């Protein structure tokens, strides 16, 4: 579409181009047939330039006024507004897309949009410049005026065409990303619905009558208590058996120790009794001898 604008601007700037070179036929892009608001705005921009072209001999007089640049300013603003609105709509559709992908697409589209706006501004500025040149060239011949007005149009046409193609390509990528995001969103919704269905099933189980749940809970607790009681009884029986084994071992060890002590001390006590008896006997003998000696002295 920008190419179309550029071509129109070129022919507009050419003024009375019929005597200089054949009119360049410009084909309207097929993309306008989709009817997007921003494309319709660009179409209006194109229609206005084409209308200016039909002024033929009146072009010089129109360029001397501010009407053309004012109209172009309004059309540029409308076009940029529609492009931004369409971009915002695509951004909403890109919700489920990864943030890095969304940021990259937005950056590329913003750059293409900026280039389009800059070139449209240049078209308007060129017209203002040509209007000033026309004012300065009053009195010159029509051929000289036409030659000045046709100096830049071809370059502007190529630039606008390139920008339009770039913007359309970015829009297509952006829309493809939005469709991909929508598909991911549907998958996420499907998974969410599955989760909600599962939760609903669990809630249905949880909504059983309170009495049934209490009865089930009571049976469960009784089963657990019986299991714990059985385990406790088994454990106590094991402990009792272990204690009995320990008692028997202690008694056996005590009897063995007592027997060892008896085997140690009985010979010793017997020897001490024997020695003590011998000592007493010796003392008695000594005492008896000492008592018999005084009786024999008179």
Curated annotation (Swiss-Prot):
<feature type="modified residue" description="Phosphoserine">
    <location>
        <position position="141"/>
    </location>
</feature>
<dbReference type="GO" id="GO:1900223">
    <property type="term" value="P:positive regulation of amyloid-beta clearance"/>
</dbReference>
<feature type="repeat" description="5">
    <location>
        <begin position="162"/>
        <end position="183"/>
    </location>
</feature>
<feature type="signal peptide">
    <location>
        <begin position="1"/>
        <end position="18"/>
    </location>
</feature>
<dbReference type="GO" id="GO:0008203">
    <property type="term" value="P:cholesterol metabolic process"/>
</dbReference>
<keyword id="KW-0677">Repeat</keyword>
<dbReference type="GO" id="GO:0120020">
    <property type="term" value="F:cholesterol transfer activity"/>
</dbReference>
<keyword id="KW-0446">Lipid-binding</keyword>
<keyword id="KW-0162">Chylomicron</keyword>
<keyword id="KW-0813">Transport</keyword>
<dbReference type="GO" id="GO:0042158">
    <property type="term" value="P:lipoprotein biosynthetic process"/>
</dbReference>
<feature type="repeat" description="4">
    <location>
        <begin position="140"/>
        <end position="161"/>
    </location>
</feature>
<dbReference type="GO" id="GO:0034362">
    <property type="term" value="C:low-density lipoprotein particle"/>
</dbReference>
<dbReference type="GO" id="GO:0008201">
    <property type="term" value="F:heparin binding"/>
</dbReference>
<keyword id="KW-0732">Signal</keyword>
<feature type="modified residue" description="Methionine sulfoxide">
    <location>
        <position position="137"/>
    </location>
</feature>
<keyword id="KW-0325">Glycoprotein</keyword>
<keyword id="KW-0358">Heparin-binding</keyword>
<dbReference type="GO" id="GO:0005543">
    <property type="term" value="F:phospholipid binding"/>
</dbReference>
<dbReference type="GO" id="GO:0033344">
    <property type="term" value="P:cholesterol efflux"/>
</dbReference>
<keyword id="KW-0964">Secreted</keyword>
<dbReference type="GO" id="GO:0033700">
    <property type="term" value="P:phospholipid efflux"/>
</dbReference>
<comment type="function">
    <text>APOE is an apolipoprotein, a protein associating with lipid particles, that mainly functions in lipoprotein-mediated lipid transport between organs via the plasma and interstitial fluids. APOE is a core component of plasma lipoproteins and is involved in their production, conversion and clearance. Apolipoproteins are amphipathic molecules that interact both with lipids of the lipoprotein particle core and the aqueous environment of the plasma.</text>
</comment>
<feature type="repeat" description="7">
    <location>
        <begin position="205"/>
        <end position="222"/>
    </location>
</feature>
<dbReference type="GO" id="GO:0034361">
    <property type="term" value="C:very-low-density lipoprotein particle"/>
</dbReference>
<dbReference type="GO" id="GO:0034364">
    <property type="term" value="C:high-density lipoprotein particle"/>
</dbReference>
<keyword id="KW-0597">Phosphoprotein</keyword>
<dbReference type="GO" id="GO:0055090">
    <property type="term" value="P:acylglycerol homeostasis"/>
</dbReference>
<keyword id="KW-0272">Extracellular matrix</keyword>
<feature type="region of interest" description="8 X 22 AA approximate tandem repeats">
    <location>
        <begin position="74"/>
        <end position="244"/>
    </location>
</feature>
<dbReference type="Pfam" id="PF01442">
    <property type="entry name" value="Apolipoprotein"/>
</dbReference>
<dbReference type="GO" id="GO:0042627">
    <property type="term" value="C:chylomicron"/>
</dbReference>
<protein>
    <recommendedName>
        <fullName>Apolipoprotein E</fullName>
    </recommendedName>
</protein>
<dbReference type="GO" id="GO:0050750">
    <property type="term" value="F:low-density lipoprotein particle receptor binding"/>
</dbReference>
<feature type="repeat" description="8">
    <location>
        <begin position="223"/>
        <end position="244"/>
    </location>
</feature>
<dbReference type="GO" id="GO:0034380">
    <property type="term" value="P:high-density lipoprotein particle assembly"/>
</dbReference>
<keyword id="KW-0445">Lipid transport</keyword>
<dbReference type="InterPro" id="IPR000074">
    <property type="entry name" value="ApoA_E"/>
</dbReference>
<dbReference type="GO" id="GO:0071831">
    <property type="term" value="P:intermediate-density lipoprotein particle clearance"/>
</dbReference>
<dbReference type="InterPro" id="IPR050163">
    <property type="entry name" value="Apolipoprotein_A1/A4/E"/>
</dbReference>
<dbReference type="GO" id="GO:0043395">
    <property type="term" value="F:heparan sulfate proteoglycan binding"/>
</dbReference>
<keyword id="KW-0850">VLDL</keyword>
